[in-house]
């Protein structure tokens, strides 16, 4: 049975929350974003992918993002003794934009939040309190929270959307189980005044003695993050700053690309683990963005999944039918699981072993003939399109199983 949703309360104001609010407000739906601003600015730089540019165009903010973003034509992966693997978007984007941007997260979030405000969404800077309805698979805003919203809502909103990220407010209230991945890593990140970059604008991902790192060139600095097994992070120092600074000095790769670099910011640290919620929708509630699931920062899939889920949830809300919400849930869970699979191929070494074998065999006439086709579909990993491309994923699975030519992928695994 179709339900016309006229009012929505969104918990949070991150990218997925703001994008969803903007899309719904444009449709005349009454939307409120309920969030308490962060005490500390999120320092990480975001490396966008071409698939996100399409969403920025839909929101009408591409030019604003371009004004402070660093033009990004591709990505480069360093695999130590196995060399560099550069990927240029122009080689395999097809109808998709052949570029993206690297952006400071705080400015990017402000752009999307202002977009939501311009569309008509109301922002309440409050700590929203949500309660479980006794004996039901349902939540509601507390009387205190409704009162803080003044007369914006006449009673409970038709839909409560949890976009609180890892806080996972609604899943915790409703005891919604989640599937966790096998990795338990620590991520450390900060901004440096400089770091060695092989290609201008490219995001650089590098295999380390333990774990891997990103270098995201911004307009006036470099965001450098390190992701490594938590047991190795703990050995690097007593504080996040000690751990980060020691890793820059002691890792055999990082010390070569940060010579003379100065850290400009404090170090932020979080647990990097993989989680996919088993349910994303229910009676009067839905999950979006990282609340629905998060995988890994490699390949910049997190923001892509979050913004894609926002556009798909907006479609479901406009439709209003149970089938539309179930379609949303199936689609996002499938997207998350697909990226989980892709990320695992990176960590277990199969992905870049396959790329290396392909390069080694290009003199073979058959390989030379089929290489452009294979390259186009494998390249969709880096544009963000792979998670929604069934044929590309089927080709990837085939190559991961049959395309390694007796090479041991452990040699290129992330340790």
Task: Describe these PLM feature segments.
Residues 2-14:
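Beta1/beta-strand and adjacent pyrophosphate-binding region of the FAD-binding site
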Residues 43-80:
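N-terminal FAD cofactor-binding segment of flavoenzymes
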Residues 17-18:
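N-terminal Rossmann-fold NAD(P) dinucleotide-binding loop
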Residues 315-415:
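C-terminal helical "tail/cap" subdomain of flavin- and related membrane-associated enzymes
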Residues 25-44:
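Glycine-rich FAD pyrophosphate-binding loop
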């Amino acid at each position: 049975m179709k339900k016309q949703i006229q009012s929505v309360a969104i918990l949070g104001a991150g990218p997925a929350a703001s994008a969803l609010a903007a899309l719904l407000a444009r449709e005349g739906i009454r939307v409120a974003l309920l969030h308490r601003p962060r005490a500390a600015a999120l320092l990480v730089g975001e490396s966008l992918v071409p698939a996100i540019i399409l969403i920025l165009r839909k929101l009408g903010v591409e030019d604003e993002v371009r004004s402070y973003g660093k033009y990004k034509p591709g990505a480069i992966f360093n695999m130590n003794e196995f060399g560099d693997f550069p990927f240029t978007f122009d080689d395999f984007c097809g109808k998709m934009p052949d570029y993206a941007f690297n952006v400071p997260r705080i400015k990017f979030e402000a752009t999307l939040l202002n977009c939501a405000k311009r569309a008509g969404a109301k922002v309440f800077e409050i700590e929203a309190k949500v309660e479980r309805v006794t004996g039901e698979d349902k939540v509601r805003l507390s009387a205190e929270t409704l009162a803080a919203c003044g007369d914006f809502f006449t009673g409970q909103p038709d839909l409560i959307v949890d976009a609180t990220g890892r806080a996972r407010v609604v899943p915790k209230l409703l005891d919604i189980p989640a599937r966790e991945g096998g990795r338990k890593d620590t991520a450390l990140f900060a901004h440096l005044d400089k770091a060695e970059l092989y290609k201008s604008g490219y995001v650089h991902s590098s295999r380390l003695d333990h774990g891997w790192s990103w270098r995201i060139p911004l307009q006036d600095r470099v965001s450098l993050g390190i992701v490594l097994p938590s047991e190795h992070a703990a050995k690097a120092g007593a504080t996040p700053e000690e751990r980060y600074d020691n890793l820059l000095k002691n890792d055999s790769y990082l010390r070569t690309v940060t010579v003379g670099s100065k850290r400009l910011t404090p170090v932020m640290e979080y647990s990097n683990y993989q989680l996919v919620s088993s349910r994303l929708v229910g009676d009067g509630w839905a999950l979006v963005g990282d609340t629905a699931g998060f995988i890994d920062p490699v390949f910049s899939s997190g923001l892509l999944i979050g913004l894609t889920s926002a556009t798909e949830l907006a479609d479901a809300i406009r439709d209003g039918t149970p089938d539309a919400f179930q379609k949303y849930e199936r689609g996002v869970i499938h997207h998350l699981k697909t990226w989980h699979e892709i990320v695992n191929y990176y960590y277990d070494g199969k992905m870049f072993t396959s790329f290396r074998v392909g390069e080694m065999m290009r003199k073979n006439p058959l390989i030379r003939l089929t290489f452009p086709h294979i390259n186009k579909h494998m390249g969709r990993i880096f544009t963000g399109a792979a998670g929604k491309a069934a044929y590309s994923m089927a080709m990837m699975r085939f190559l991961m199983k049959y395309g390694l030519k007796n090479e041991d992928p452990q040699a290129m695994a992330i340790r």
